[in-house]
Structure formats: C-alpha cells, structure tokens
C-alpha cells in the first residue's frame, strides 16, 4: 500500500531535505576548518565557535518558515532564542578560556538537543525524522560531556568541534530519508 503525503507535508519535506543537506555540508566544512585552529582559544577559533550556533539560528528561521503549513514552529523559535544566547555566550566565554567555552557549548548542546528531539518526535509522521530524534538525544549526552570536560585538568576544544561531525551524518541521513516523503506528492 502506498500512501501519499499531504501537499503541506510534501512541500515541507522537500524544504527540510534541502536544508538538511546544506546543514550537513556546512557542519563538515566547519569541523574541518575549526579542527585546524582548535588547539588553542584565539580570536579565530572563538569566531568559528560563535558562527556555528548562528548558522543554527539561520537554519531554524528557514525551517520555521517552511514548516508553518505542517504545525506550529514554536519550538523552532525556542531554538532560535537558545542559539542566539549561545552565540553571545560563546563570544563572551572566548575571553575567559576553554573551560568557559565548553560550559556554554555544553549547555547549548543540551538545550538544542532537547528541542531537536521534541521537534523530531512531533514530525515523525513526515518520515525521515528518526535520525533527528537520535541526534537530539545524543546532543543532550554530548552537551553533558562537554560541560563535564570543562573541569578536566587540560580541557580541549577538539571534542566540542568533533560534535559537528555526527550531527552532519545525521542531517545527511535525514535528508536522504526525507526524499521519499518529498516525492510522494
């Protein structure tokens, strides 16, 4: 039995598919560039760290605009606010050292992960959301580990930077899985 997605779901799935491919590509490029400068906290590494949640803001804005026909974008607005706060927090923490950056990054990963998990659960019927649900849950765990790593003897940015790579993989898988939903109508 073949089911056909409602026009709103199909349109949203196509928009999310494009967004998820773009997010995967950005995350991989960002991780590669940021790994190259993550051995110490400099103006460049801080700027790169601030850029990541700002891209999350832009993606959430695009997501909210494309998702209006399939449900309330309230959680996406929460994600926008949280990611903006994270960007500001990272800019400030950059002058305080790696432990402060890891605490802000960790707190952001926990809250953004919870939002991603809940958004994924609410979009389950659209298809392609299991990677987002899993990724959201893993973000909560990763964020907790970043927060804990801030208290280590020699905390490093590389684990926080590495956080982008599994995220990119999950976005890529979700984009591929959303292809079926986008084509059903």
Predicted regions and their residues:
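Core segments of transmembrane alpha-helices
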Residues: 23-30, 79-87, 135-140
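Alpha-helical membrane segments in multi-pass integral membrane proteins
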Residues: 104-115, 129-146, 160-170
